[in-house]
Amino acid sequence: MEHRVFTIANFFSSNHDFITGFFVVLTAVLMFFISLGASRKMQMVPMGLQNVYESIISAILSVAKDIIGEELARKYFPLAGTIALYVFFSNMIGIIPGFESPTASWSFTLVLALIVFFYYHFEGIRVQGFFKYFAHFAGPVKWLAPFMFPIEIISHFSRIVSLSFRLFGNIKGDDMFLLIMLLLVPWAVPVAPFMVLFFMGILQAFVFMILTYVYLAGAVLTDEGH
């Protein structure tokens, strides 16, 4: 059985799925109220949380428009932006002693990966049509189609593994790193490790967001749109 560090969720249950679900919901609630606070009293000259959120949104759209174009970057921002923010908050909550990152659970990162996987295929089929979308899987050379098509299918399914395990592995490793540091220096606040984990939390949220846009671009942009 996997050893788990004691968290506040253990006051209610020691079940693995319950603990993961507890922090998934807690993170969503925290994100909702923080986001609500940032947008509750909008000002022409942004200050405080509003300024932070507007800077984040501008940064995401600035990067995304280079991948998929400004119009589509804004269209798919509700998905990519929400996932980026949620992954960030999920990563950050695990830094707090007594809390656990939902993204340190592979079952949760798998759900996020599946959401992206099914959504970009849905959008690709909706925009291009079923047959035209899957015709791209066969490649430009017809006689290579029997070889290219299964390779493309495997490649797309491997994205689920790549997305979920990359996030899970990095955050799980970060949590173990923090635990070891706290055990080694329990009498002092390890500021440097906390800064490293904060940076890694931002980086993993950024990578997940970028890959979401990349997969969407590959699905909805035709050859003429590139």
Curated annotation (Swiss-Prot):
The chain crosses the membrane at residues 18-38, 79-99, 105-125, 134-154, 179-199, 201-221. The gene is atpB. InterPro entries: ATP_syn_F0_a_bact/chloroplast (IPR045082), ATP_synth_F0_asu (IPR000568), ATP_synth_F0_asu_AS (IPR023011), F0_ATP_A_sf (IPR035908). GO terms for molecular function: proton-transporting ATP synthase activity, rotational mechanism. It is found in: Cell inner membrane. It comes from Helicobacter pylori (strain P12). GO terms for biological process: proton motive force-driven plasma membrane ATP synthesis. Key component of the proton channel; it plays a direct role in the translocation of protons across the membrane. This is ATP synthase subunit a. It is a multi-pass membrane protein. Pfam families: ATP-synt_A (PF00119). One of its GO terms (cellular component) is plasma membrane.
